[in-house]
Curated annotation (Swiss-Prot):
SUPFAM superfamilies: Heme-dependent peroxidases. GO terms for molecular function: heme binding; lactoperoxidase activity; metal ion binding; peroxidase activity. Induction: Early induced by infection with an incompatible bacterial plant pathogen. PANTHER family: PEROXIDASE 17, PEROXIDASE 72-RELATED. This is Peroxidase 17. The lineage of its organism: Eukaryota, Viridiplantae, Streptophyta, Embryophyta, Tracheophyta. Removal of H(2)O(2), oxidation of toxic reductants, biosynthesis and degradation of lignin, suberization, auxin catabolism, response to environmental stresses such as wounding, pathogen attack and oxidative stress. These functions might be dependent on each isozyme/isoform in each plant tissue.
Length: 329
């Protein structure tokens, strides 16, 4: 069988690596006009199959974009020569529903082969996760390329832990030109979804090495968490991140005001005087939260590494280079 068609296709993709594009709305209006509709359709299917999955997919944008920009490096599986980001400290046993992105990519490849990047899928799917659960809808800028590699170490070095305090989070977000308001609004992504007992055991039983629970926890809520996450129990048990875990709303901020934040990194936003004003604002004004969240997601989506990229056929692996085709044929 002739290798020429394969070589032509892969050489075409190699030109993509070096050309790059400016992000813009409706990027696929000519090359794949139904791209955004296809992504939303697949997200609806995922939501029907498992409601929690859309919250899981929404988190991909944060965990991807903070590590060397929005390039779908998060989606790459480990290889013998590369430790990717899926097993980094902030992602292992935490991020899930990668199969939803697989399904979206498969649908897009059928409609528009080798056209829509996995990095753009992450951005569109995150937006749709919010909109489909009652939150804001916004126009996304597209035209990203997929990374050629990933780094577990880079993820470990950048991503915050559930123990992070507000001061650390402020400094982290400032590194990416995201304001305090952006940071607090984007933390509202925890309006939907669940977290593991593993992430809060120290809050319940040994906050700051005291051997005591976090004093910021409202007593009745602490008792609820004690029952959910007993000392010595299964740390993979999950609990709701706010009182309305399947609805994107401002209940998350109301819970923080009342001392019912699930994660330390959430509750610290209310105990810190710099971030408290935004928590109170969003708890009282859902429309303002929605506006700030959408603006923050757009800013987050603008983070780019400037590294070479491609349009992956499979979001879990980089494309074979022409030399790879020759070696295995």
């Amino acid at each position: 069988m002739s290798l020429l068609p394969h070589l032509i296709l892969y050489l075409t993709l190699l030109t993509v690596v070096v050309t790059g594009e400016t992000l813009r709305p409706r990027f696929y209006s000519e090359t794949c006009p139904e791209a955004e509709s296809i992504v939303r359709r697949e997200m609806k299917k995922a939501m029907i199959k498992e409601a929690r999955s859309v919250a899981s997919v929404m988190r991909f944008q944060f965990h991807d974009c903070f590590v060397n920009g929005c390039d779908a490096s998060l989606l790459l599986d480990d290889t013998p020569n590369m430790l990717g980001e899926k097993l980094s400290l902030s992602n292992i046993d935490s991020l899930r529903s990668f199969e939803v992105v697989d399904d979206i990519k498969e649908a897009l490849e059928k409609a528009c082969p080798a056209t829509v990047s996995c990095a753009d899928i992450v951005i569109m799917a995150a937006r749709d996760a919010v909109a489909l659960t009652g939150g804001p809808d916004w126009e996304v800028k597209l035209g990203r390329k997929d990374s050629l590699t990933a780094s577990q170490q880079d993820s470990d070095d950048i991503m915050p832990s559930p123990r992070a305090n507000a001061t650390f989070l402020i400094d982290l977000f400032e590194r990416f030109n995201l304001s305090v308001k952006d940071m607090v609004a984007l933390s509202g992504s925890h309006s939907i979804g669940q977290g593991r007992c593993f992430s809060i055991m120290f809050r319940l039983y040994n906050q700051s090495g005291s051997g005591k629970p976090d004093p910021a926890l409202e007593p009745s809520y602490r008792k609820k968490l004690d029952k959910l996450c007993p000392l010595g129990g299964d740390e993979n048990v999950t609990g709701d991140l706010d009182a309305t875990p399947q609805v994107f709303d401002n209940q998350y901020f109301k819970d923080l005001v009342s001392g019912r934040g699930f994660l330390n990194s959430d509750q610290t936003l209310y105990t810190n005087l710099v971030t408290r004003e935004y928590v109170k604002m969003f708890s009282e004004d859902q429309d303002e939260f929605f506006r700030a969240f959408a603006e923050g997601m757009v800013k987050l989506g603008d983070l780019q590494s400037g590294r070479p990229g491609e349009i992956r056929f499979n979001c879990r692996v980089v494309n074979r280079r022409p030399i790879d085709v020759l070696l295995v044929s």
